[in-house]
Amino acid sequence: MKKSNTDTCCLTLPLKLEKWQEDRLAKRFEIARQIYNTMVHAELKKLRNIEISQPYRQIQKQIEALNWKNQNDKARLKSLYNDRNKLLNTIGFSEYGFKADIKYYYKHFNDNIGSSVAVHGIAPQVWAAFEKMLFHKEGKKVHYKKKDDIHSLRGYSVTGKSG
């Protein structure tokens, strides 16, 4: 983002809540954490099932045998990564697959967590964690959220109305 030429100031005000509002927010954050952890658990199971399959193991073995720095291996690695991605996509291991899967987990909490929050807020967070682990060097494994780890939720609405 481009730096602004005008002088700017940021004002941070504390959010003063009544006890019942605080309790309602805490309940929704806890429910979001439970949905997140349930989704992580289910997707880890799905990933473990594909990891023990023969085609996936063969692809991984070939990927590990090649060197990314070697110019001759780069094209082969690219095709192997594409094959692995196709294999993962067949079981619904994509952002849209996660958004489709979350409908099974938030229904029980439908009074507190709406579909827009679950589909556009929680599922992309779970996908981002798996994406780091699978496709980037940043992540080694996906962690569950501890109690009081979630401090905000977001949803999405086409009409612009929230809640």
Where are these regions (language model features)?
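Nucleic-acid substrate recognition interfaces
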Residues: M1-G163
